[in-house]
Amino acid sequence: MTSANKSNIPALLALAVSAFAIGTTEFISVGLLPLIADDLDIPVTTAGLTVSLYALGVTFGAPILTSLTSSMSRKTLLLWIMFIFIAGNTMAATASSIGILLAARVISAFSHGVFMSIGSTIAADIVPEDKRASAISIMFTGLTVATVTGVPFGTFIGQQFGWRFAFMVIIAVGIIAFITNGILVPSKLRKGTKTTMRDQLKLVTNSRLLLLFVITALGYGGTFVVFTYLSPLLQEVTGFKAGTVAVILLGYGIAIAIGNMIGGKLSNRNPIAALFYMFIVQAIVLFVLTFTAPYQAAGLITILCMGLLAFMNVPGLQVYVVMLAERFVPSAVDVASAMNIAAFNAGIALGSYLGGVITDSIGLIHTAWIGGLMVVGAVILTGWSRLMEKRDRQEA
């Protein structure tokens, strides 16, 4: 592991640029659902599959493809990832039916899963151990900046020029990310380690890692019960106009970026303890939103608080999975990171699916407290994991 110095920063920034491109394409559908539904003449909940199937593509693609590409040069793999990303979004921009659009989203999702897994391990590997969460948070800043600017700007572009043009802009960002990776990411990165079936079996049967994957899915996915349908909630429940929603999404994204950086700082030394308290506050905010959503001022404040907490847990979850993998399955750290990325997206898929079911059955307002229940599950399991961590320290 190299020491932290200024030469690490360009590589981290290159990863952040790629994360920005990928983050924009992941979440842009949230703001474009009504436009996609109108253009393809489908229900908005069917258009919502562009979010949930993307998440499923990451869920299944991340561990499988990361394992298959484990012996490749990290830089070569990064460039191939961005090439596939560009191809998938080109297919989406030219899709003539929902079937083609969903297939394009899954292709893009495959690049997402591999990038986020190896990106996290590269970021963690090029800094000292006590700076790992901060390094990962720098990489994930690209993802949060995508939510700050990419999603609201993409929503605005879609409203002005059509949803297809929004995807064309993403293609341009992907090309920039490809060039940035080629120039700034050093060739002399830690080589991938070929993971054996025995290592993978050991990984998927390790109770501590499996527990963390469930925590990730519940804690991260709870917010997406609400977030996937945030645009219609803001319009139909809170009473904001469509043009105002893009501005609110910008504020939501700024809150996410701030929360991500705070989460990285809080998680540097004791990530599991930090996660426990983050999830408690996150659950409370989601429950409160159930009561404040019908009121514009109170609802807006609560939604911004939800944004502050939405990604705050990401650096801690990723650094903790690396810590556990190095302890229990050191030859499969990349695959463990990929499986946690899969868990993030399993949470998104579950959350967005539940959001659609709830919206169709009992109404948008109920997405908040049901999302809160998911996060309560993460609180309970994080508390359990925290107790086991304390026991390990006592036995050491």
From Swiss-Prot:
Keywords: Cell membrane, Membrane, Transmembrane, Transmembrane helix, Transport. The keyword Cell membrane applies. One of its GO terms (molecular function) is transmembrane transporter activity. The keyword Transport applies. The chain crosses the membrane at residues 12-32, 48-68, 78-98, 106-126, 138-158, 165-185, 209-229, 242-262, 271-291, 297-317, 338-358, 362-382. The gene is ytbD. PROSITE patterns: MFS. Belongs to the major facilitator superfamily. It comes from the Bacteria. Signal peptide: none annotated. SUPFAM superfamilies: MFS general substrate transporter. InterPro entries: MFS, MFS_dom, MFS_Efflux_Transporters, MFS_trans_sf. One of its GO terms (biological process) is transmembrane transport. This is Uncharacterized MFS-type transporter YtbD. Its main location: membrane. GO terms for cellular component: plasma membrane. It is found in: Cell membrane. It is a multi-pass membrane protein. CDD domains: MFS_NepI_like.
